[in-house]
Amino acid sequence: MKPNYNVDRAPKRSDEPVWWSLFGAGGTWFAMITPVTVLVLGILVPMGVINAEALSYDRVVSFATSIIGALFIIATLALPMWHAMHRVHHGMHDLKFHTGVVGKIACYAIAGLISALAVVFIFML
């Protein structure tokens, strides 16, 4: 007996899981890590709650050149950018700006460029 439905044996593969994973990682990072970073660097240190000597130039450079520090800085710059550009790409579609593949490539190329620049700048330290 033959089934009544056809199974597509070579389904079209989508690249959306890649973009959605970067979108999700960027959103999570932006929601959980960025507020703490802003609190510490933008409020607590200037108010004197945290000693400014703790963030002296030498200590910051040694942190930024360590593997953990470099990954933290790269993730802080790159992941929210992937999140934002994914939102821009889908927001343009929602606003009826159907840019197709060109818009997709432009949005994700900008996020990739910012990510690459973050890596380059870390290696320049």
From Swiss-Prot:
GO terms for molecular function: succinate dehydrogenase activity. The chain crosses the membrane at residues 30-50, 60-80, 105-125. Keywords: Cell inner membrane, Cell membrane, Membrane, Transmembrane, Transmembrane helix. Gene3D superfamilies: Fumarate reductase/succinate dehydrogenase, transmembrane subunit. It comes from the Bacteria. It is found in: Cell inner membrane. This is Fumarate reductase subunit D. It is a multi-pass membrane protein. Part of an enzyme complex containing four subunits: a flavoprotein (FrdA), an iron-sulfur protein (FrdB), and two hydrophobic anchor proteins (FrdC and FrdD). Anchors the catalytic components of the fumarate reductase complex to the cell membrane, binds quinones. One of its GO terms (cellular component) is plasma membrane. GO terms for biological process: fumarate metabolic process. It comes from Vibrio vulnificus (strain YJ016). Belongs to the FrdD family. Its main location: membrane.
